[in-house]
Amino acid sequence: MSPARSSDVLVIGGGIIGLVTAWRAAQRGFTTALVDPEPGGGAAQVAAGMLAAVTELHYGEETLLGLNLASARRYPDFVAELTEASGQDLGYRRCGTLAVALDADDRAHLRELHALQSRSGLESEWLTGRECRRLEPMLAPGVRGGLRVDGDHQIDPRRLAAALVTACERAGVSVHRTWAERLTVVRDRAAGVVTSEGTGLGAGQVVLAGGSLSGQLAGVPDDVLPPVRPVKGQVLRLTVPQRYAPFLNRTVRAVVRGGHLYLVPRENGELVVGATSEELGWDTTVTAGGVYELLRDAHELVPGITELPLTETRAGLRPGSPDNAPLLGPTALDGLLLATGHFRNGVLLTPVTGDAMAHVLTTGELPDEARPFSPRRFGATALTEQPA
């Protein structure tokens, strides 16, 4: 092993969560390094980029709602700052979201969601099917009703990731384009990593932000190994020809045959359709069945989609945790912190995660809004449990 090069903060993982953590750490004056063979890759290259704190509300996730809302409120300033730091457009759109129902059961479910949103103090408006189609004329005639949520926006995750890579480089982050092979532990304290090339990288504090791979790093003691599992998602990208524009004016969501479907229109004419949710380990195969189900359900929602060119099919891995919420902050191993397990909310939670990690790296304590998401909420038995 070659001699260790040291930094104040070493971030393992160059997805959007690792990148924003490294950027914020460097802004705080820490000498910062990041290890990833392909910074800006990973789940961000597949994600749709919905900033849907309101429409993503689920029963039993009210605590996560607070973190989601805190991050959503920060997005406009975050986008302005990152745009200035990187010189790049992030594809941020305040176009709103429309969640619709195609049958009576879905309509009842949306009514329940509307009631939950109201009890939680969230703004959403119930629309009839006719009102939904007035907003989005391409919707199927069978749409029974919907929820209009003007506060749920979108961003292009690929542009976000690229901008964060540039911002990190401009802020002086040392980027090592290689794999972190093993955590180095010295006298019961995380002290760095050894890369796949045999290089030792030392650090005062180590942040494990490896997404779905966070639980795979060698050398991490079992009692602090993050309980993160991969959840496969298949996503399609289509192109809207100019003669059909505007195809959709805002993000459209629905539950079709029990599965969650979304259509996210970009300003450049791209339409993102997703996503499956599959517990299949590390498999990232795009399957005929997955593509068929997405197109079938999307056609039921927006029949005209079959006229659009299909330009890309991708599958990625979401980092799921036992309670579908992120793990943020210090672990029981001194010097090792986590920023992982964001599941379906990684893009939405990027601003608040960066702020929370910068705060804890500086003070040793999580800010109030992030305290419920300490890794220490999981006991030793929970660390090895996986959902059936």
Segment roles from a protein language model:
Residues 66-69, 100-109, 147-166, 285-289:
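Short beta-strand to alpha-helix junction loop
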Residues 50-131, 135, 298:
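Dinucleotide-binding Rossmann-like beta1-alpha1 core, especially the glycine-rich loop
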Residues 7-33:
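N-terminal Rossmann-like FAD-binding beta1-loop-alpha1 element of flavoenzymes
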Residues 17, 40, 213:
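Conserved Rossmann-like nucleotide-cofactor binding loop
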